[in-house]
């Protein structure tokens, strides 16, 4: 009997599927670039055929195949002229794969009817109900439905002393880690938990996320990033958000301390220089000091089981490697079209090749330093949610200023939202009246890097999510 993976491979390699899917891919990605002048005539899409294929492909364990299935269903739901029965079928496939986030987002954007399941066959609804039930957990009397990867993590954590997780960034690691943490607090007696982050820049953000999650779950616990034991240490549940250096400080000051759970985020960095060596040392020390559970989380690590070398060999261990896809990412290559300085060729890097989509036209770009801001601004064509990565803080400020000039040249009467004006007042008061951020905010632009006050960084992120800030230029921190 042919396996699901073999069947999926046969489908995606068939000439008919490749031709039909390529037409869909070009049309779908091109529609997301407003300024694109398309050079493709995708013709009519065989939606019934592609959605039927997607229903089979979602059973594959191959990440690249899952990406194809997800693209088909996402494109169907986003296609404005497509009859509702096709959209409902695509949503049903998402539901069967427990991808509830995709459904929720589609409904919130009015791309999908909230009651889509009422139009599905009875057997499909029975299968969806069984899947939702089997992937559900109860956390503090509230039911949460997990995707396949999250459910595997949750179950493995219950059955083992240590687990090592490797999955793409979009798989939902942060969500399941927070629920593991909160459920552990509920089930254990005043547990002591360490959540290790790789850099100081992440400490406050993770601490705030944990505080908010516990508050939303109505769970009482002391959450701190200060390497000093709180006064009620023995009488309360405690969560410490540390770097390895802060954990080392606590271990040196309290040689008899025991912890119950250690979560190591970005655990693959254990192989990085001297800080990785220190992390390995403190983890090994904690593992020999008592009966502590460990969770290692990494983005697509080739050998997540290697992290178990840092803890006691007697631990019951399990590694979890997943290629689960919950979102699509389009890698677009933009290059000069011949000698022209105003015409830019746009290609999609997918299916192990460059796929020609079309071109965009900009004003004449004579300076290399203006290439990123001009292309980003023209390609976005006024849409919000534009995130630009640069190498350093000074470059983030420079690109933001250039974007501001482009926006105000096109829209001289631009007025920022009330929330942005309030942020401008806060920056003037808490940082400096002449801080460059103030001027770029007036055009709906912001920059973001690690060495900024947390309150300002958080508000920038919130305004970007709301659409009050159209362009956010940031560094990796």
Language-model features: locations:
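Conserved C-terminal RecA-like helicase domain
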Residues: 125-136, 149, 155, 164, ...
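N-terminal pre-P-loop "Q-motif" helix
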Residues: 142-159
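Walker A/P-loop
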Residues: 145, 160-180
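Structural recognition of the conserved hydrophobic beta-strand(s) that form the central parallel beta-sheet
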Residues: 195-196, 240-243, 263, 292-299, ...
């Amino acid at each position: 009997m042919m396996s699901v993976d073999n069947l999926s491979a046969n489908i995606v390699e068939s000439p008919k599927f490749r031709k039909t899917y390529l037409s869909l891919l070009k049309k779908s990605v091109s529609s997301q670039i407003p300024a694109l002048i398309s050079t493709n005539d995708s013709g009519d899409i065989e939606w019934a055929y592609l959605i039927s294929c997607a229903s089979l492909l979602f059973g594959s364990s191959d990440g690249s195949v899952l990406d194809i299935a997800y693209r088909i269903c996402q494109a169907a739901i986003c296609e404005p002229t497509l009859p509702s029965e096709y959209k409902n079928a695509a949503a049903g496939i998402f539901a069967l794969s427990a991808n509830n986030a995709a459904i929720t987002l589609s409904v919130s954007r009015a791309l999908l009817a909230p009651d889509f399941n009422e139009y599905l066959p009875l057997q499909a609804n029975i299968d969806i109900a069984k899947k939702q039930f089997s992937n559900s957990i109860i956390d503090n009397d509230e039911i949460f439905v997990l995707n396949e990867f999250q459910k595997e993590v949750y179950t493995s954590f219950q059955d083992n002393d240590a687990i090592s997780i490797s999955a793409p960034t979009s798989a939902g690691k942060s969500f399941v880690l927070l629920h593991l943490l909160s459920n552990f607090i509920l089930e254990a007696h005043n547990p002591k938990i360490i959540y290790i982050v790789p850099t100081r820049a992440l400490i406050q953000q993770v601490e705030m996320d944990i505080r908010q999650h516990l508050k939303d779950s109505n769970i009482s616990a002391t959450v701190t990033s200060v390497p000093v034991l709180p006064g009620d240490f023995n009488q309360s549940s405690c969560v410490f958000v540390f770097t390895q250096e802060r954990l080392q400080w606590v271990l040196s000051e309290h040689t008899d301390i025991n912890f119950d759970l250690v979560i190591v985020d970005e655990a693959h960095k254990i192989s990085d220089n001297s800080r990785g060596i220190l992390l390995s040392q403190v983890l090994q020390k904690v593992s020999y000091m008592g009966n502590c559970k460990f969770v290692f989380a990494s983005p697509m690590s080739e050998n997540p089981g290697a992290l178990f070398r840092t803890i006691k060999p007697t631990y019951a261990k399990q590694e979890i490697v997943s290629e689960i896809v919950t979102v699509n990412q389009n890698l677009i290559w933009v290059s000069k079209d011949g000698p022209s300085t105003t015409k830019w060729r746009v290609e999609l890097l997918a299916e192990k090749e460059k796929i020609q989509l079309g071109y965009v036209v900009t004003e004449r770009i004579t300076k290399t330093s203006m290439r990123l801001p001009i292309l980003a601004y023209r390609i976005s064509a006024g849409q919000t949610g534009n995130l630009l990565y640069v190498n350093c803080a000074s470059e983030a400020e420079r690109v933001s200023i250039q974007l501001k000039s482009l926006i105000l040249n096109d829209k001289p009467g631009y007025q920022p939202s009330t929330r942005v004006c309030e942020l401008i007042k806060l920056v003037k008061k808490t940082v400096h009246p002449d801080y460059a951020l103030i001027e770029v905010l007036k055009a709906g632009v912001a920059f973001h890097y690690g060495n900024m006050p947390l309150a300002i960084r958080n508000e920038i992120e919130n305004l970007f999510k709301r659409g009050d800030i159209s362009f956010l230029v940031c560094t990796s921190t």
